[in-house]
Amino acid sequence: MFSMIRGPRAAFGTLIGQWRRGMMTTGNRRLCIKPQEGPSASPQTQRPGFKLPGYRPSDWDKKMLMWSGRFKTVEQIPEFVSFEMIDAARNRVRVKACYIMMGLTIFACLVMIVSGKKAVSRKESLIAINMEKKAKWREDAQREKEENALDAKAQ
């Protein structure tokens, strides 16, 4: 019913709805109120500022750092590395994996093209192969039917 209302009535209804929800008055918005400062924490309870930012890489992360070419051996990798270094190594390995998959896909397509051309030169096709297979199935079914008929006569 409300979707059928158009024109100035809908605009007026929206205006009234906003006013009732308190959106029209700027005094009640409370968007720019600064938080009240409470008692400040003592310096002993704050965390020390000398902690090294970083990440302790797992064995898998170390392998990715090596595969990406960042380090040559596992012994060269420091105990803590930055998140950016791990992320860059993951991205580089991801891109290498994509390139490898693209290359394998192109190689597989070329192999299929070559095998298809060889099959055409041998006069092979999927239709002929399927027809031969179905003919063999029919022969097997006919043979089983005859064997069942002979067994029934023998009894």
From Swiss-Prot:
Xref: InterPro entries: DUF1075
Topological relation to the membrane, as annotated: Single-pass membrane protein
Record has Transmembrane helix as a keyword: yes
GO cellular component, one term: membrane
Signal peptide positions on this chain: none
Transmembrane segments: 95-114
Domain of life: Eukaryota
Similarity comment: Belongs to the UPF0389 family.
Protein's UniProt name: Protein FAM162B
Gene behind the chain: fam162b
